[in-house]
């Protein structure tokens, strides 16, 4: 037998119509990775409000303690009045006295 080099016959395949195209990328890259160089600016006016909001919150924490104390005192007073009215109404029911209106608390438009 003779040593005759054999030719390798390479058969090329015809492209398949339903096959998706390659997404690219090298040997060590995942296809569809991060796109570099694309930058979107923040919304207009977005950065202007942030420092002001922080300053307002700090002022509210530091300087508005008196307002908060006043508000809490008003809430305590309202709760006390509501409790008193509920107790008065409950006592009238227990005693059997029919409820009547305190006309001095009402506002009337008639002269």
UniProtKB/Swiss-Prot annotation:
Keyword terms of this UniProt record: Cytoplasm, Metal-binding, Ubl conjugation, Zinc
UniProt region (Disordered), positions on chain: 1-37
Mod. after translation: Ubiquitinated. Degraded by the proteasome.
The UniProt record lists the keyword rRNA processing: no
Transmembrane segment boundaries: none
Cellular compartments annotated: Cytoplasm
InterPro entries documented for this protein: BEX, TF_A-like/BEX
Segments for region (His cluster): 100-104
Keyword check for Cytoplasm: yes
Note in the entry: The mouse orthologous protein seems not to exist. A publication described a sequence that they named Bex5, but it probably represents a pseudogene.
Family: Belongs to the BEX family.
Protein's UniProt name: Protein BEX5
Protein source organism: Homo sapiens
Gene designation: BEX5
């Amino acid at each position: 037998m003779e040593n005759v080099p054999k030719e390798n016959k390479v058969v090329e395949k015809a492209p398949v119509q339903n096959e998706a195209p390659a997404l690219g990328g090298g040997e060590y890259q995942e296809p569809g990775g991060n796109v570099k160089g694309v930058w979107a600016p923040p919304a207009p006016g977005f950065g202007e409000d942030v420092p002001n909001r922080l300053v307002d919150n700090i002022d509210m924490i530091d300087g508005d303690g008196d307002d908060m104390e006043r508000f809490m005192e008003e809430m305590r007073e309202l709760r006390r009045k509501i409790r008193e009215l509920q107790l008065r109404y409950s006592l009238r029911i227990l005693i059997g006295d029919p409820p009547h209106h305190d006309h001095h608390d009402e506002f009337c438009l008639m002269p």
